[in-house]
């Protein structure tokens, strides 16, 4: 059995941050569960370009509000209780509104190793 707390993961190398977000990677590839689980904070009043060419992701909004704009498609509001699933490697923009950051629970398949950040195209590489 594996037991971890958000606080202990946040205070370790499992916390990865960029200019627009931070991700606490609580479950990773080396945990051998077949997926990874993260608590990700999207900073308020930011926009992040993302395109997971190598991963599928499901995201549940726990707090805050914003929107997701699928490139070439629709824009969907995000608020607590919203689940969105990127099941087609959807290229998108993720925006948090000005008044509050968004806190999201995220699941990735295949699992990430823990050090990945978005490249210039919004992509996470596949790492061993």
Swiss-Prot record:
Pathway: Amine and polyamine biosynthesis; ectoine biosynthesis; L-ectoine from L-aspartate 4-semialdehyde: step 3/3. It catalyses: (2S)-4-acetamido-2-aminobutanoate = L-ectoine + H2O. Keywords: Lyase. It is an enzyme of class 4 (lyase). The keyword Lyase applies. Gene3D superfamilies: Jelly Rolls. Its EC number is 4.2.1.108. GO terms for molecular function: ectoine synthase activity. GO terms for biological process: ectoine biosynthetic process. Belongs to the ectoine synthase family. HAMAP family: Ectoine_synth. This is L-ectoine synthase. The gene is ectC.
